[in-house]
Amino acid sequence: MESKFKFAADAVLRGKAYPALAQWSATPFSDEWRQFGYCWPYTVPCELHEHCVTHDFAFDIDTVSHIQGTDYFYTIGLGFFDFNIDYFDLVPEQVFQQGLTVLFYYHEGDNPARIKQRLDQLCYLHGLDIDCYLFVSGNTAADKIKNFAWFPDHELLYWHRNQAVPATPIHWDHRPYRFTILNRSHKWWRATVMADLDRHGVLDVSQWSYNTNVTVGDDPADNPIEIDSLELRDDVEQFMARGPYCCDDLTADQHNDHHLHVPEHYTYSYCHIVIETHFDTDQSGGAFLTEKTFKPIKHGQPFVIVGAPGTLQALRDLGYRTFDQVIDNSYDLELNNTRRWQLARNAIIDIQRQDPDAWLRICREDIIHNQQHFLATKRDRLNTLYDKLLHQLATT
């Protein structure tokens, strides 16, 4: 029997489901359609619908008022999860009357355990069964939580948005830089990483960027790396004072445009040091993969990932290879944030000591495998998610 999602929506316009609970008014394919995430209650067009279209995964979609049966998901795409919003108070009463399952779809890495606690509180407040909803999260810890499921949305999102850009041809000639290191926005742990790499001479052999002007309200006190234990406070302050740093001609907005591509970021260096979005994923114990990781995979580079513990294992679970034969990836197992960074830094320094051309040749088979694996259809990812959700429903 063919797997098929059944989605319920408040309205369907020109084949697109109108974002659930939304107060903002817009029509598909307009500039306003991209503004939902900035307007209360910050629900957005559900990317899961688009992934099904892109990868030819069967689905039905209809309005709540027209559907028959209870085997439909009332999908709520979240721009971000706001703990001050009572989501169930906004859900149409007909959804609960018809026995539909509310499906939250959230591609960010916030701690899913905290989200579950909040949603369960709201269920109790409204007299709802806590099994009335399922939640899809970009945090791998979700797979360990009842009614939650992990899905690597950013893999499919980058696959789709960068689809018009051919994968960068892999070459084996000499390259002018050892590493590529890109930072579009400032966080204090990222500045700590970059200052430490600078102190060890890694930036001297790298093409790299760090935009000190784009900030996200990060508090220095929340730095998960113990900056004073590494005696880096002065180095970080000096590093920030000299910024911003760039290695291309793109603007900050263009750096965040997944449709754009700078081939030299991948062809001019041997290894990509990925500075991920989160280093400790909101104290969740999970990992969070974004387009930052999938860019070097698509465009043919080995990588070291400066991110949460278990990030490399999450990639392996998705079928990717992590160059264990030439990189000491033990850092991925370290739970202590400061120690994990030290181990990752040591792995980077060890790569720098190698003959770069010989090192790259050893990586050849895995580079090619990763690129081809990324370019393949992601229909299997959707099927895995479908099975996860049905299993959750069957065990409620």
Stretches with model-predicted labels:
Residues 2-274, 280-290, 294-299, 303-396:
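Pol beta-like nucleotidyltransferase catalytic core
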